[in-house]
């Protein structure tokens, strides 16, 4: 389902834990990480689509989360032609998204990446709030910047502490490289339990943070797809 401009209605999900770290999922069979997201089906509201995608991709139910906020307007990104299937080029341009900020009130063991027969992720971890800005694929970066920035005010309102993307001296932190090198992966058939960190993540500093990555076994697709470029409902 595309709008008149060729954008597919979509929802994005920023899930935070008690330390204001964000859920970060590794796309199945690939080396790319992203937030949960997916298309809005005909007749669905954005909120209904969000809860459906949350269960399909992360295995969580409405009682496991609390809605903290959402973006006021649609945020759009265009997908490069090389990532678009040939038969829909010229019609499909990209995604327009409503982003939701959710607070995790359940436990880490409630996260189940294989809740459906077609999992989206095969590993996950908690990352500092601003890390995804530099870790996500480039053509999504501006939308991530807009969504994280707009929704950060809800996090600050609850914690009464600034949530800045800058470290000491105003220098932007070299986030993704260090976090990726310092992450430790462990396997689990059902998503396992992502052990808690001792460090708070209210601000991004120059301190290297060690994060846990939880992996699950899942079949590798025959051809990796770097983005939700096809007009499918379970992306």
UniProtKB/Swiss-Prot annotation:
What are the protein's UniProt keywords? Hydrolase
For this chain, one GO molecular function annotation is: pyrophosphatase activity
Q: Which CDD domains match?
A: NUDIX_Ap4A_hydrolase_plant_like
- What EC number(s) does this enzyme carry? 3.6.1.-
Question: Which region ranges are annotated with the description Disordered?
Answer: 161-235
PROSITE patterns, sorted: NUDIX, NUDIX_BOX
What this chain does, per the entry, is described as: Accelerates the degradation of transcripts by removing pyrophosphate from the 5'-end of triphosphorylated RNA, leading to a more labile monophosphorylated state that can stimulate subsequent ribonuclease cleavage.
Please indicate the residue ranges that the annotation assigns to the motif Nudix box: 38-59
Q: What NCBIfam families does this protein map onto?
A: PRK00714.1-2, PRK00714.1-4, PRK00714.1-5
What is this protein called in UniProt? RNA pyrophosphohydrolase
Query: Which HAMAP family does the record associate with it?
Result: Nudix_RppH
Bias (Low complexity) ranges: 203-220
* Stretches with biased composition (Basic and acidic residues): 171-196
- Name the enzyme's class: hydrolase
Q: Does the keyword Hydrolase apply?
A: yes
Q: Record keywords: Hydrolase included?
A: yes
Q: Which cofactor does it need?
A: a divalent metal cation
